[in-house]
């Protein structure tokens, strides 16, 4: 599956799958990057969901921003990202792996999500 690079709230991001009215924000774990979402995105696309993955600070295209990998930096970025995605999709879900799951839980404690999948939070 091919991914389309773009910027989501100033974060480097990849858009996976066909346009859809429902989508999942994919948050990688420690040492990961937005590119690791390929396998998940393929399965989500088969179920009719588009996936967007982002690089957290200190990872992928943001390696030089390691000092910004703190909740008071990441949580506002993720909240902006979700707000932008809500403008594109009717239904929004979240997948978080490890560090991404932790940041997802911090950023969206009360967000009305259509689905939430956490791997090793």
Segments (PLM) and residue ranges:
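N-terminal cap/lid segment of alpha/beta-hydrolase-fold proteins
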Residues: 1-19
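Proline/glycine-enriched tight loop/beta-turn segments at coil->beta junctions
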Residues: 17-23, 49
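The conserved beta1-alpha1 loop
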Residues: 25-29
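The serine-hydrolase catalytic nucleophile loop
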Residues: 30-42
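Conserved alpha/beta-hydrolase
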Residues: 44-63
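Catalytic nucleophile-loop/oxyanion-hole region of alpha/beta-hydrolase
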Residues: 60-88
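Gly/Ala-rich beta-loop-alpha elbow adjacent to hydrolase catalytic centers
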Residues: 96-104
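Active-site nucleophile loop of the alpha/beta-hydrolase fold
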Residues: 117-121
